Amino acid sequence: RTAAMRDVRKIISEKFDYLSRRYLLEAIKAQEVIPHIREHLAMGRKVVVFHDYNKGGGFNPFDLSERAIDAEMSESGDAEAINGIIREFRTEFKDLISSDLFKASSPITNFQIEFPGILLVNGSVPAKVRRENVAKFQDDASGPQVILVQAQAGKEGISLHDTTGKHQRVLFNLGQPTQPTMAMQQEGRIYRMGQVSDAIIRYLNTGTNWEKWAFATTIAQRASAAENLGSGEMARAIKDAFISGFEESGDYRAGMEGEGKGGKDRDKAANDAISEYDR
């Protein structure tokens, strides 16, 4: 039975690989962030949402069906034992199998339904239309607005910051900041010289053990790589900022006290720690 249990775990893990998990996490976050976006729109703000993948969406890796097992492809070679465990699993975890959690659509599909007329910036959108979408977002006359930006397409070359003070900017990142330098570029779309209101930046966190593991391992490795490439103290500050942000995850609602505050103070403290040699 132990070998058959390992076979079932292998079946699930093969269905639920790294990329599939990232798709699912992003789909869940896209669904959960919708009420937060609506709150900010109601306050007259313009909202930027970054996502990692154009495709994706949820699926249920735990919806297992009985199957014919190739003895050479399994550790136990016992189809009856494997299918027996699958039947037990389906009975004990029927609520998990039927959960709506796994039915979420990709961010693009979901947002096009929830926010008709949403502005898109991604590789599937012609360059001319992307420029028009950015211009419309930046136009105060368009009012509170949502723009959905795919990470690679929007990491540089576009400005989405508030230059007039009429519509404060909010940025939600549905992906994981697995590339610190890219995350900095994304934040720079609304947080840069010339902004006249505080930029509000939020990273979504599902709180799952898998996301904690993915965040901890990837950020530690890549931020350290940036450090080793010569960024020194500043790279360490970037890594610390991401870690503290992840640890401080919470249900921050629109309009809360201190919203959009504190980032510059942290940046200054990090900058003050840099030696003249590092400068």
List where the protein language model places each region.
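Short, surface-exposed, charge-dense and proline/glycine-enriched linear segments
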Residues: 74-94, 151-158, 228-238, 266, ...
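Generic hydrophobic, helix-prone segments enriched in Leu/Val/Ile
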Residues: 12, 21-28, 69, 86-89, ...
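Alpha-helix boundary/N-cap detector
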Residues: 3, 8, 28, 76-80, ...
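Low-complexity, serine/threonine/proline-enriched polar segments
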Residues: 63-117, 250-257, 266-269
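Conserved helicase/translocase motor-coupling segment
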Residues: 1-64
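A conserved SF2-helicase RecA2
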Residues: 178-278
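Residues at structural and domain junctions
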Residues: 7, 19, 97, 146, ...
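Conserved RecA-like P-loop NTPase helicase motor core
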Residues: 85-225
